[in-house]
């Protein structure tokens, strides 16, 4: 296999001290076991001179008064104000400390409720051992957790296969669909599979069943999908119209114009490089993030390139793509970059978190891999900060007054052919995706079994090896999507597109279907809890085992690097029975279920701080809301005011109290609501 494309975070758990599990009660009381529990046992790949520290909540006020709370990437502090901590860190030369999550006033109240404000990154001289400094800090009662800022590593240097005329010549036929005029839609079997793309191994219907779903909805620009991956090619002609735009930022600015802690974050942020410029042209960039983005929201019906699941219909924009870049050329992101990206996505409007990366499955063959986590507790207890960030997205993305309350995280299940999904995918709060081929069979590389919740088309290059030659062999059995021109070159008329495979390509199919469903709920003006949509996604999946031939082995050609050639291999489908999740994701069935569920949305009551303001977009509460104009009446203008600015209602708090108000659309539809103005700040100034 030459181009499998799910990112893995490699690490080796450090062994516990011999006999630690046999510690006596006396030793525990002396703090030996307690100190060990405070420090993550995983230090492999740790960045020198850096630690991630969570302080005890008892010293929160001390940190605030010392000004450390307001520290961030652009202004680290040099003292914590906690004497015992400062005494230790003064010994490690020139240390700096900053909050893991920069202050964003819009979300600070939630951050403090979740305890994320207690996490800090401490930097010190690289001459000192991170393990020794971690052990010293763990002895302090003021410190509740110490973790290492590990480097995230790509599991593979896989390469995409650019679309060429020679690849296209292998196609026996092209799927015909009147849906859109995008010229390569006929090659995207993963959306519309008529069973005739190749002479064999293509089964009609082995797709995401999106063609009928497009008649119901093609996406909505109010729905944002955050892509944690390599960067997205922001200049790609098939993607640029569906990129998320931070309207309060300035493109390529070095200033944090909107005060969210990140300068120049116009289409997202390059967390790996530490600036707002999203990049795709680095030496080790593979085009992975751009490929994922195209599956979700390449512009549909624009007469150009490919189609996507939720990319609009030509007259209406699709869902928006937020680039949260955690890999950038030769720069591999760290755990610090990853968790910042996750929280950033939640705070800036994303409701779907697309994650085509993870650790190695704990059930992976140790001859080929280094197995990692096998249980929920192993992963969660070893990666507390990572879990906290993901949990923040699950519970704080979206809005209780919006279409979706909470966020949905979709992970690739992994490519080790292991009988258990990798983590974090396998954790029950997330969607874990296995990959299938164009005939419904499990892809030869996919993880399956424990922790797997759903399947989706991910391609299967080795299985389609008889189609094509050399590097192009099997390409037509893979997923076709967008690629940066730095990957494909610019000379070919087919440049900007190509094939990849992996559970990391199955993953965005599920993320896109989720986003399409939320878009449809927006159209219907229905409200859902994220858990409700997640359950419906799984309940509406299509059973796939009925299409498997259990009487014979699935044959494929596996490229063996040591031998330099491909060898015939087999897999027994009986081993996969009941282990590919609830079935293959089904866009039409999912949207149909949404139509019959949920609660009708009404304009919410408004809460605004005294001398502050709250901004609400009314369009999601009204039929054809984006095309409407609005008027707002406030009964007591001494308490609050409202300015209508296009599709934004800006409420300002003038005096403490409550007042009745109403909002009316040009169509005549109206809602009554209450505005409450209150002092929302505590003694530290946080809302």
Where do the model's predicted regions map?
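Protease zymogen maturation seam
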Residues: 106-121, 135-224, 232-238, 242, ...
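Substrate-binding/access-modulating region of protease and related hydrolase catalytic domains
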Residues: 24-27, 215, 219-221, 230, ...
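Hydrolase catalytic cores
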Residues: 293-297, 322-327, 343, 351, ...
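Inhibitory N-terminal propeptides of secreted protease zymogens
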Residues: 29-169
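Extracytoplasmic soluble-region selector
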Residues: 595-687
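Flexible, small-residue-rich helix->loop connector segments that border functional cores
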Residues: 209, 228-235, 248-260, 274, ...
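Active-site-adjacent substrate-recognition loops and nearby beta-strands
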Residues: 283, 306, 334, 338, ...
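C-terminal subdomain of the subtilisin-like protease fold in secreted/lumenal serine endopeptidases
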Residues: 350-357, 406-407, 521-621, 642-644, ...
């Amino acid at each position: 296999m030459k181009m499998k494309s799910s990112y893995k975070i490699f690490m080796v758990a450090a062994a516990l001290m011999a006999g630690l599990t046999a510690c006596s009660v006396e030793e525990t009381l002396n703090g030996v076991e307690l100190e060990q529990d405070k420090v993550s046992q995983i230090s492999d790949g740790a960045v020198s001179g850096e630690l991630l520290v969570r302080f005890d909540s008892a010293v929160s006020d001390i940190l605030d008064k010392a000004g450390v709370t307001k520290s961030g990437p652009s202004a680290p502090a040099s003292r914590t104000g906690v004497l015992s901590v400062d005494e230790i860190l003064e010994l490690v030369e020139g240390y700096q400390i900053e909050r893991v999550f920069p202050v964003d006033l819009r979300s600070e109240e939630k951050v403090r409720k979740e305890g994320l404000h207690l996490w800090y990154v401490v930097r010190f001289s690289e001459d000192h051992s991170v393990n020794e400094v971690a052990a010293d800090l763990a002895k302090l009662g003021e410190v509740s957790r110490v973790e290492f800022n590990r480097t995230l590593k790509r599991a593979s240097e896989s390469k995409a296969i650019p679309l060429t005329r020679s690849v296209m010549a292998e196609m026996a036929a092209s799927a015909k669909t009147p849906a859109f005029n995008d010229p390569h839609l006929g090659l995207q079997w993963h959306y519309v599979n008529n069973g005739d793309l190749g002479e064999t191994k293509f089964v009609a219907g082995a797709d995401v069943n999106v063609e009928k779903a497009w008649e119901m909805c093609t996406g909505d620009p109010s729905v944002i999908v955050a892509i944690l991956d390599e960067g997205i090619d922001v200049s790609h002609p098939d993607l640029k119209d569906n990129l998320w735009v931070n309207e309060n930022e300035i493109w390529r600015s070095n200033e944090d114009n909107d005060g969210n802690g990140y300068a120049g974050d116009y289409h997202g942020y390059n967390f790996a490089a530490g600036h707002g410029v999203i990049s795709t042209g680095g030496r080790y960039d593979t085009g992975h993030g751009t490929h994922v983005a195209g599956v979700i929201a390449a512009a549909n019906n624009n007469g150009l390139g490919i189609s996507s699941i939720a990319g609009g219909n030509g007259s209406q924009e699709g869902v928006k793509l937020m680039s949260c870049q955690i890999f950038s050329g030769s720069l591999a992101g760290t755990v610090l970059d990853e968790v910042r990206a996750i929280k950033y996505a939640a705070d800036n409007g994303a409701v779907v978190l697309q994650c085509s990366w993870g650790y190695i499955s704990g059930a992976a063959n140790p001859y080929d891999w280094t197995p990692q986590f096998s249980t929920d507790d192993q992963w969660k207890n070893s990666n507390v900060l990572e879990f906290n960030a993901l949990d923040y997205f699950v519970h704080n993305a979206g809005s209780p007054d919006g279409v979706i309350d909470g966020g949905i995280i979709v992970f690739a299940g992994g490519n080790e052919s292991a009988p258990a999904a990798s983590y974090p995918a396998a954790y029950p709060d997330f969607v874990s995706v296995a990959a299938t081929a164009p005939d419904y069979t499990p892809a030869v590389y996919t993880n399956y079994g424990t922790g797997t919740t759903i399947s989706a088309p991910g391609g299967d290059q080795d299985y389609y090896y008889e189609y094509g030659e050399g590097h192009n062999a099997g390409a037509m059995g893979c997923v076709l999507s967008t690629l940066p021109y730095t990957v494909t070159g610019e000379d070919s008329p087919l440049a900007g597109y190509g094939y990849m495979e992996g559970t990391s390509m199955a993953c965005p199919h599920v993320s896109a279907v989720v986003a399409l469903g939320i878009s449809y709920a927006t159209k219907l003006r229905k409200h859902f809890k994220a858990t409700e949509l997640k359950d419906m996604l799984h309940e509406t999946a299509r059973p796939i085992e009925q299409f498997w031939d259990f009487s014979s082995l699935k044959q494929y050609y596996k490229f063996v690097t040591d031998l330099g050639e491909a060898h015939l291999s087999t897999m027994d489908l009986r081993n996969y029975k009941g282990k590919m999740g609830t079935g293959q994701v089904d866009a039409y069935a999912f949207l149909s279920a949404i139509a019959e569920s949920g609660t009708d949305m009404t304009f919410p009551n408004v809460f605004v701080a005294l001398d502050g303001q709250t901004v609400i977009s009314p369009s999601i509460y009204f039929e054809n809301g984006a095309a409407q104009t609005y008027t707002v009446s406030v009964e007591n203008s001494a308490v609050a005011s409202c300015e209508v600015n296009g599709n934004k209602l800006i409420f300002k708090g003038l005096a403490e109290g409550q007042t009745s108000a109403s909002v009316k659309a040009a169509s005549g539809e109206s809602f009554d609501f209450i505005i409450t103005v209150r002092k929302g700040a505590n003694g530290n100034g946080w809302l």
